[in-house]
Amino acid sequence: LSKLPGEIVSANAYMGVEGILKALDMGADVVITGRVADPAIFMAPAIHAFGWSLEDWDKLGKGTMMGHLLECGGQVTGGYFAEPGKKDVPGLGHLGFPIAEIAEDGSFFLTKVPEAGGMVTVETCSEQIVYEIHDPENYLTPDVVANFKQVSFTELEKDKVKVEGAAGKPKTETFKCSIGYKDCFIGDGEISYGGTGCVARGKLALEILRERLELVAPGVFDELKFDLIGCNSLYWSSDCQYNQEPSEVRVRVAGRAKTRTEADIIGNEVEALYTNGPAGGCGAVKHTRDIVSVASILVSRYDVKPEAELFTV
């Protein structure tokens, strides 16, 4: 922690089911938590309802599998899945969230209400299972080390998928803890160019901005990024990869600086392109924001004591 470049402003340990169980045991109808691992939100009610032991690792592995599939809501009912003509999803404008029906032995299936949009299929479940898990045989959570290696999906009927094969191993002695610290300021500016020659005018705008920032703020920015949105903002190629020139592009420049005043320079220079840059610039915007960055450490689980308080409203 002493090596972090800025002032620490937050520390949030990823807790498990313990605090949620305390709240449920107190009779809570709604539980509001601090930072907990996503699967714990869904697994805790199952533990509470069925009286599972917190050392029944296979049941906890199954519960974690359920929570992992549910944690991002509409992602398992077709959100973040659709690709027209290849993976079509009906009703994304009224996408339904998933429902898990779980039995005491930890077996469960996923579904959704029939009138809601989206779909629950083997394919949507298969994409969600690999989301953010790193090693499927050792998915580390505060409550269990889950093993998803043998998980299988079976479509029982339309929008109803059975999930089997999850297991678990004893939990680790540590919690992940996210440390927030004051890092820098980021300034950015954008301006659009459209019509014939828009790519050439966008490139000229970027050349002007490079020259201006070197002139008015030499050595100020720790990092600078120059994008021509519509050509190279996602893949960082040096040129537009089109057989035909696009009808519009958007120039974007962003940079990291140590002070807000320095970061403001970028947006001001982009805005100046209205009158001092290529023809036809429009829609300029600028922003400056202070950045709280995140570093991750491990802390002893025994140093973190969840508490619960019951309110009646």
Question: Locations of the language-model features?
Answer:
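Structural signal for hydrophobic packing residues in well-ordered secondary-structure cores
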Residues: 24, 28, 54, 69-77, ...
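An acidic, phosphate/nucleotide-engaging active-site surface
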Residues: 1-33
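A glycine- and small-aliphatic-rich helix-loop capping segment at beta-alpha/alpha-beta transitions
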Residues: 45-56
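A conserved active-site cap/scaffold subdomain adjacent to cofactor or substrate pockets
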Residues: 60-170, 186
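Conserved active-site and cofactor/substrate-binding residues in soluble primary-metabolism enzymes
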Residues: 15-19, 26, 60-64, 120, ...
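Gly/Ser/Thr-rich loops at beta-strand to alpha-helix junctions
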Residues: 35-41, 258-260
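Short glycine-/acidic-enriched loop or helix-start segments at secondary-structure transitions
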Residues: 41-44, 81
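C-terminal non-catalytic interaction/assembly regions of soluble proteins
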Residues: 164-313
